[in-house]
């Protein structure tokens, strides 16, 4: 029972990369509920360069529909406020000293449906990435068997293991999508 030059754990790690990317993409979808990840893409013109917001301020969620941005340097408050407005996130900042409050507006039903469609696109892209990894793994196993580095039985066993890993990751992707869809549609 030799596996030749095939590493199933490496294949699983590559598949998990697709779910990690999906988690990151889904985290960026605005759901009507405040999340610090909503302002992650905001770049602030500071100290002569563009910097991520999280390098200039602490972002917290004091209420389900409110973000609080505590700017560390008083001179950067206006720049942070401008960056938030320019980011097209649909958030309007209210500044009190060094604290910028961002109220998250209600999502209408039409916008919620659009967000669900976007979430489905992200999930499908992740599924496709996992299937590509599966295909690469199966191709590698077939080549190993063709070159007589592994037996035909080992090839079949590895192909079954690859399919089990694929099914597991696809199931995880479906669970992530279902959870995000529920979060988006919950009023």
UniProtKB/Swiss-Prot annotation:
Gene3D superfamilies: 3.30.1360.40, Ribosome-recycling factor. InterPro entries: Ribosome_recyc_fac, Ribosome_recyc_fac_dom, RRF_sf. One of its GO terms (molecular function) is ribosomal large subunit binding. It holds the Pfam family RRF. The keyword Cytoplasm applies. Keywords: Cytoplasm, Protein biosynthesis. The keyword NAD does not apply. One of its GO terms (cellular component) is cytosol. It is found in: Cytoplasm. GO terms for biological process: cytoplasmic translational termination. Responsible for the release of ribosomes from messenger RNA at the termination of protein biosynthesis. May increase the efficiency of translation by recycling ribosomes from one round of translation to another. Belongs to the RRF family. This is Ribosome-recycling factor. The gene is frr.
């Amino acid at each position: 029972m030799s596996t030749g030059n095939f590493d199933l754990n490496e294949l699983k790690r590559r598949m998990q990369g697709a779910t990690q990317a999906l988690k990151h993409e889904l985290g960026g979808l605005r759901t009507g509920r405040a999340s610090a990840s909503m302002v992650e893409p905001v770049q602030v013109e500071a100290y002569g360069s563009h910097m991520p917001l999280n390098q200039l301020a602490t972002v917290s969620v004091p209420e389900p529909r409110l973000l609080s941005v505590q700017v560390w340097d008083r001179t950067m408050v206006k720049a942070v406020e401008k960056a938030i407005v320019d980011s097209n996130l649909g958030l309007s900042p209210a500044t009190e000293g060094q604290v910028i409050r961002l109220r998250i507006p209600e999502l209408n039903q039409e916008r919620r449906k659009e967000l669900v469609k976007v979430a489905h696109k992200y999930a499908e892209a992740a599924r496709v990435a996992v299937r590509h990894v599966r295909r690469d793994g199966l191709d590698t196993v077939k080549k190993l068997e063709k070159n007589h580095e592994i037996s035909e039985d080992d090839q079949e066993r590895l192909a079954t293991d690859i399919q089990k890993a694929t099914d597991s990751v696809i199931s995880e992707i479906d669970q992530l999508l279902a959870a995000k869809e529920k979060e988006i549609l919950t009023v």
